[in-house]
Amino acid sequence: MHYSEIMVRYGELSTKGKNRMRFINKLKRNIQSVLSIYPQVHVKADRDRTHIYLHGTDYQPVAESLKQIFGIQNFSPSYRVKKSVPALIEAVQTIMKQVYQEGMTFKITSKRSDHSFELDSRELNQTLGDAVFMAIPNVQVKMKAPDIELRVEIREEAAYISYETIRGAGGLPVGTSGKGMLMLSGGIDSPVAGYLALKRGVDIEAVHFASPPYTSPGALKKAQDLTRKLTKFGGNIQFIEVPFTDIQEEIKAKAPEAYLMTLTRRFMMRITDRIREERGAQVIINGESLGQVASQTIESMQAINAVTNTPVIRPVVTMDKLEIIEIAEKIDTFQISIQPFEDCCTIFAPDRPKTNPKIKNAEQYEARLDVEGLVERAVAGIMITEIRPQAETDEVDELIEGLL
């Protein structure tokens, strides 16, 4: 027997009242986006659950993808069976013989949406339970927390049987909590921040600052690969590459070394905010962790934040580095993040950066620069690429080779 569908149950969506169907429909679209690499798979969303029809597609890779999608509480692979008592008896006996081990307990739970079926739920439980006893005489029934719970659903088109319940990622469907711009450096922290924002339903676009020739094509590919890792949690992500060379050279030439990092981050924040406004997002997200580096003291955050009134979400701000690394390993971004490519935040990093910069000093040094002109030129020069769950990596590799 082969699985024919997967039944998906919702998590926090049960608390969403009148907005429930909006959340469910968004989850459906996210599932369709992530599973788009399986053309035979069909997704149908109902108020109480979503049905994923496999149509011959291998169950295992689909299940691995579903485990990552936010908004799913759990799911169960199911067998499609002819809607008749003899067919159900045969299927239940076959399944139990496959999964039963000595000493296990079981329970039958039946549900009918087709009330014209010849047996009601209670009668079906009894009939199928008797069939299990015939196949495995020594098996014991247990109504609470059995080792094996066979779930039987009688629908209009067929009957479905399942016995596994696999835990999902929980959280909220991506896109149900607004939209944010993720400042993605290529390090360990910012992809984790993006993941945690996705978990709470925030639709993200990744903003990456590139300063060629100081930053390499490898650094750009690294950031795109990190973005691709995040797509498995909610579908395609827009990757926004910002040209940053001119700005960094101007800062390096005209500002004191101690304030290089502060001014660099202030420009990044301004540019991200301008892109946010143009693309209809509500928040900025970054991977700052309090006290981890010189630019992540409270004083530095205050000086950098002063250039925007937009809310800045810092999902990892109170985490230790080891806590962040643990999540990075879980979401499979860690090995990419530690690849030895320099990013914009490291190429001109001063030996003794200011840990308690003053806003008035930052503004004084910025007066030496054409701030608005530099920001406008950077925003005008952005390049946007849609990153998919399994992008055509050959095309990306060809692009990198061309740049090299």
From Swiss-Prot:
GO terms for molecular function: ATP binding; CCA tRNA nucleotidyltransferase activity; tRNA binding; tRNA-uracil-4 sulfurtransferase activity. Residues 60-165 form the THUMP domain. Its main location: cytoplasm. It is found in: Cytoplasm. PROSITE patterns: THUMP. GO terms for cellular component: cytosol. One of its GO terms (biological process) is thiazole biosynthetic process. It catalyses: [ThiI sulfur-carrier protein]-S-sulfanyl-L-cysteine + a uridine in tRNA + 2 reduced [2Fe-2S]-[ferredoxin] + ATP + H(+) = [ThiI sulfur-carrier protein]-L-cysteine + a 4-thiouridine in tRNA + 2 oxidized [2Fe-2S]-[ferredoxin] + AMP + diphosphate; [ThiS sulfur-carrier protein]-C-terminal Gly-Gly-AMP + S-sulfanyl-L-cysteinyl-[cysteine desulfurase] + AH2 = [ThiS sulfur-carrier protein]-C-terminal-Gly-aminoethanethioate + L-cysteinyl-[cysteine desulfurase] + A + AMP + 2 H(+). Pathway: Cofactor biosynthesis; thiamine diphosphate biosynthesis. Keywords: ATP-binding, Cytoplasm, Nucleotide-binding, RNA-binding, Thiamine biosynthesis, Transferase, tRNA-binding. ATP binds at residues 183-184, 208-209, 265, 287, 296. It is an enzyme of class 2 (transferase). CDD domains: PPase_ThiI (cd01712), THUMP_ThiI (cd11716). SMART domains: THUMP (SM00981). The keyword Transferase applies. Its EC number is 2.8.1.4. InterPro entries: Rossmann-like_a/b/a_fold (IPR014729), ThiI_AANH (IPR020536), ThiI_fer (IPR054173), ThiI_N (IPR049961), THUMP_dom (IPR004114), THUMP_ThiI (IPR049962), tRNA_STrfase (IPR003720), tRNA_sulfurtransferase_ThiI (IPR050102). Belongs to the ThiI family. Catalyzes the ATP-dependent transfer of a sulfur to tRNA to produce 4-thiouridine in position 8 of tRNAs, which functions as a near-UV photosensor. Also catalyzes the transfer of sulfur to the sulfur carrier protein ThiS, forming ThiS-thiocarboxylate. This is a step in the synthesis of thiazole, in the thiamine biosynthesis pathway. The sulfur is donated as persulfide by IscS. This is Probable tRNA sulfurtransferase. It comes from Streptococcus gordonii (strain Challis / ATCC 35105 / BCRC 15272 / CH1 / DL1 / V288).
